[in-house]
Each structure stands twice: as C-alpha cells, then as structure tokens.
C-alpha cells in the first residue's frame, strides 16, 4: 500500500507543473527579423509599399484599399479578392498607456479567453515574436484558430514609435491564400513594417 501511495505522489509531482504550464497564457517571446535596410526581392515581387504617417508597411499587390467595412474603422484597410485583410491604425501613447509587452499580453489574453456570452472560439496555436527593424522594437502576436473559425489565422504587429503605438492586423484563411503566396511570406510581409525617415 505504501508503494502505491508513493507512486501516486510521484505522479502528481510530475503532472502538476505540466498542468500549470497548460493554463499559463504568458507569451513566449523570441527575437527575429533584424531589418537593417536589406532589399528583399522575393517580398517586392508580391507586395506594394504603403504609408500611414511615418509608418511604412507592405500589402499584397492585388489588394484594394477599403473604407467603412466596420463601424469603427480608422487608419488604412486593404483587402484582396481572396479575403486577405490588412489593417493599419495608430493611437497616442501617454502616461496612462500600458507598456508594449503588457499590450501584447492583453491581446493574447483577449484572444485566448473568450467572453462567456459568445460561442467558444479558441485558437489552436498562438505565438509571440519580437521583431527588430532597424532598432525599432515590435511584437508580433500570431493566432491560428480552430472551429468554428477553422483555417483562420490572425497576426497583430504592435510597434511603439515617437509617442505613438502602431497596429498592423493581418487576417487570412489558410485554405484560401492567393495563388503563389505562402503563409511564411505573409508573416514576413507584416514583420517588414518599418518607419520612413524622409
């Protein structure tokens, strides 16, 4: 009997840390994409450069700029015939604003814990990547949804620059990508957002 109790205790010791990790929604951050003004021929072939103030970002070449898709639309929004949605907006940062890291944690929490009044829609995967383009720090939160939003991926790139926080949202369905465009290229496209010094 003592042997069974000891085995049960050891089992609980191994399982408890795994359970705590399963409910922990703190994003794992890793650094990538140091831009340093590098020319990307492959990205230039499928994207066009747009501006929102000093914010320089890429959209797919065949996309059309749209307005009024949602009641609270602001910034610039683009959509392709394949349903790829690209939306850039900005807001001022003041003393009451949370940090960039806290902002991303809030986005992750909002996306991974649904409201109790709506149908449960949980991502099957999320990840947070730290992006450094010419010394300007951005954080990219990526969400891959399961049922009922199966095959949908959202990416949200958040950047602080000169007292302004910029958001770039990219939304697409993995089974409806434009011809010849890969998910890796879309990820690279959104992470390439930088600032014009002109």
Where are these regions (language model features)?
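Short N-terminal secondary-structure initiator segments
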Residues: 21-38, 97-120
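Bacterial N-terminal signal peptides
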Residues: 7-16
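A short acidic-to-branched-hydrophobic micro-motif
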Residues: 74-106
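Beta-strand elements of well-folded, non-transmembrane domains
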Residues: 92-94, 145-147, 174-176
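Signature of long, low-cysteine stretches enriched in small and polar/charged residues
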Residues: 109-161
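Positively charged n-region of N-terminal signal peptides that target proteins for export
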Residues: 1-4
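Short hydrophobic/glycine-rich mini-motifs in sensory/regulatory modules
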Residues: 163-168
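N-terminal targeting sequences that direct proteins away from the cytosol to non-cytosolic compartments
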Residues: 19-85, 149-151, 169-198
